[in-house]
Structure formats: C-alpha cells, structure tokens
C-alpha cells in the first residue's frame, strides 16, 4: 500500500513540504531514542571538539566551517554541542545527555537501527511514489532541540548547503521521535517558496585557506507572516524539498524535541557540487536508498 496518496504528492509539489503521520511506530521511536542514549553514554569527546555548535550564521562559520572536525564528519558519527554547555576548562556544566545539539552525519551507514529506518519499505515507497529513479542518501542527523536551551534555527534552504545541478534533486525526511509542537520548536515553512531558487551557498574554500568554508550570496529577508507551522506527532515525518524556506524557533519549553532526519538526492542526471562541504568518500560513497 502506498504511503503517499496522489493528493499528497501534489501537495508536496505545490507547497514544498508535506506532513505525514505514522511513518514510525511509537516503539520504533523509543528504540531509536534508547540507542541514542547508549551512544551518548559511551561518547568520548575530543578536546578540540569542545567547540560549540551555533545556528547563527557568523558563529556557524567560525565554529563549524573552521573546524576540520565538522568538514570531515560526512562519513563518521560525531558530536556537536549547544552553546554554553562547557565551562572555561571544557568541562560539562549540564548533564552530557542535555548538552548536544546534534549528532551526524553517518548514522544511516553505521548504526543498524537508524540504517533500517532510513531504508525502510515505507521510505522506499515514498521515493518511488515521488518517481525518484536512483535516490542516494547524503547524510543523516539526530537533532535534540534540548528543553530550555535548544537554539533557534534561522530561515534557510537545505540546497544552500547541499547544492546540485539542476536544483530540485534533494529532499529531507524529518522524523519526529517525540511530539514536535509549536511549544517545543516545530518546523515552520513558507509554502511554495521552493519555486524561487536559492540566493546563498555554503562552499568549500580553496585548499590551504582558512576558514574551510564560506558563504556566497546572502539569505533573503523573509516576512515572518508568511511562515506556517508544521506540528507533527511522535512517529510522524515531514518531507522537505531542498529549496523550501523553513525555520524553527528556540525551544523554551521543558520538553525536548528529538528528531532523526536524513537527506536523499535523486542521483539520476544530477551533478553533486564538488564545492559542497559534504563529499562522498572512499570509505562511504553515497549509498543507494533502494535495497
């Protein structure tokens, strides 16, 4: 049975995003969260990694782009932290399970539970219904959106970071492992904004230069009134077109908002930009979604 109806497909093409209920069962969500707790419990944080992740553009360049740890994380499982979770000596000032912004970017390759969800029959069915011929998996992330400190994610388009020629070949699958409501930082979209192209790209700088990445162009200013909330219940998912403008507010509630998200690219007749921060490696070529 198809996960998407014809009406769903049309809505996704018209608006650039689609909320789906029940992609995962509550038990599957809980299993992913338990496995993530085990990963955190055993994590060994390198000294240089006690640099904090930021969603602010300048901070993002300074901390992520300048750090080899980030730019070489495409084929690894690595840890990125919220602001203010370390003291001056690099020690945790909050419980370590509450310190993380995200873990990325190869859970889909190296963690069996996450791999199973990524390649699930439902996800494959969605891609076939969207007429994807040879979709590959680019990256995956576990995003925590910690209670009280989970930072705002400013308006952006995924194609800024995951650029292809032609455009329109990348889709995010954003799976809520807990209820994602307005109170704890659900996604907001500008419907139809995926038709307007992109105005900014994050690119690798020439070898031997610093920082390791830079931005070309600038993000447009968006009217806040154009954004529509996309709350989703535990186990539901949001399909995200690579050019649709979206954001999420800071999580000021006392409830976390754990999410597993991954990006898919239609590789048929598509050029993946060699300037993107994320590149396939010998250790991990972009794996085919279809099994």
UniProtKB/Swiss-Prot annotation:
Family: Belongs to the PhyH family. PHYHD1 subfamily.
Disulfide linkage: none
PANTHER family in the record: PHYTANOYL-COA DIOXYGENASE DOMAIN CONTAINING 1, PHYTANOYL-COA DIOXYGENASE DOMAIN-CONTAINING PROTEIN 1
Cofactor or coenzyme needed: Fe cation
Record-level Gene Ontology MF annotations: dioxygenase activity; metal ion binding
Reported function: 2-oxoglutarate(2OG)-dependent dioxygenase that catalyzes the conversion of 2-oxoglutarate to succinate and CO(2) in an iron-dependent manner. However, does not couple 2OG turnover to the hydroxylation of acyl-coenzyme A derivatives, implying that it is not directly involved in phytanoyl coenzyme-A metabolism. Does not show detectable activity towards fatty acid CoA thioesters.
Binding site for 2-oxoglutarate: 102, 141, 156-158, 174, 248, 257
Binding site for Fe cation: 156, 158, 246
Organism of origin: Danio rerio
UniProt keyword annotations, A-Z: Dioxygenase, Iron, Metal-binding, Oxidoreductase
E.C. no: 1.14.11.-
Name the UniProt record assigns to this protein: Phytanoyl-CoA dioxygenase domain-containing protein 1
Pfam family, one: PhyH
